């Protein structure tokens, strides 16, 4: 048995879960007219309503006791102080230091992190302004018009999600494109309409050895030099973001064109660093600073707010309750704002790569449910795709509904229609409709008894489906920064409670190693006899069918 399961709060939550499974949220709302006020958190720029979950005051108190018994506040202090809480890699976890709004020295292992970050930001600002103002010239002397960000995972998904969410702030000084897939179809499609003499590539890789990224970067260099007929043109068209400056220089990128990363920043938490260069180039450095400021706002709230009023902590506790104690196996992220169309994919990586593990930080096998699988889609699209499953499947899927009060493009009538669906869905998922109501409705519509008997069971919705509602006042850089940081801290709190190291990704590394071996076999046409018969047969079929 895990040490977590011996905690008094854990045992109480197990008992409460058995009791709550027989309750309905409709009853809880009927019994307490103050339920929304008790189970919601309002910040200056956003609101969290978690009242549509199968909880009451006793449950919340037990969840808060669990956070106390698992020392969430102590671990939070350790993270912000720069202690090495990434146990398996012996590293500090300091993505929050990238958005500190202070000049105060922050010394980690003899290095002033504040100074490093401020110097990096200053270098980024100079570079961004030079490119956006047309002073950075390509090999032919023409200004840069297009940026191609080459990366994968955290080096791609975070920046792309943000630039998509905030594209209404872009003034068109440059056009930003992203390449992440090693399938050559993507880079070929991105490069096809571009003019080599006007393109600047950002190669983002912490190690500068990531196979997918380096393959795409080599293709980009070949594309450029075949047009310029000059290998020296690389210096004017390539910059790198990496923690491995030597590898980047060996690749051909000049030292002055290399921006630093640090080992205390994980890839999926790195958009606040120079990994976010594409964001700043697209939106302007001032908007990038607003993004950082919004994340810092949430950092301060996370540090200072009591856990019962703490936006990220409550998100984490509700997720632990729904997954570990009530048994939900997945969670939907459902943005009702077109600008957030990549948010689900971003949060899928952030949460599942962080906490999708089954071994505790002590090395013991975990025998309780940890992170749910994260999935979803833009809300309106989802309504016509998988909401049937959310409403009537025998699997209960908790969902986060995320919307904004003000639309970035206020086309008359559209936002009200969108938000009417937003509010209706959370109510419908909770309230449902019983068979008595269905029969009465069908009878009122003049249906005969035979029809009612046949159809009524199919129209029953049990309801009692848990949801969180997050409402931002608008989608702007500062509010988006706060939202992203809230989910980052949610993931951290989940990891602490579940006794998981949230900042490594060994499952990713295993596949990388095997892929490298198989790639060699495919290139040499020499399939190893060490594979299982399925893999060996697939490789042989692939080779013979080429």
Curated annotation (Swiss-Prot):
It catalyses: alpha-D-glucose 6-phosphate = beta-D-fructose 6-phosphate. It is an enzyme of class 5 (isomerase). One of its GO terms (cellular component) is cytosol. GO terms for biological process: gluconeogenesis; glucose 6-phosphate metabolic process; glycolytic process. Pfam families: PGI. Belongs to the GPI family. It is found in: Cytoplasm. Catalyzes the reversible isomerization of glucose-6-phosphate to fructose-6-phosphate. The gene is pgi1. GO terms for molecular function: carbohydrate derivative binding; glucose-6-phosphate isomerase activity; monosaccharide binding. It comes from the Bacteria. Its EC number is 5.3.1.9. It comes from Colwellia psychrerythraea (strain 34H / ATCC BAA-681) (Vibrio psychroerythus). InterPro entries: G6P_Isomerase, G6P_Isomerase_C, Phosphoglucose_isomerase_CS, SIS_dom_sf, SIS_PGI_1, SIS_PGI_2. NCBIfam families: PRK00179.1 (NF001211). Signal peptide: none annotated. Keywords: Cytoplasm, Gluconeogenesis, Glycolysis, Isomerase. SUPFAM superfamilies: SIS domain. Pathway: Carbohydrate biosynthesis; gluconeogenesis; Carbohydrate degradation; glycolysis; D-glyceraldehyde 3-phosphate and glycerone phosphate from D-glucose: step 2/4. The active site is at residues 353, 384, 512. This is Glucose-6-phosphate isomerase 1.
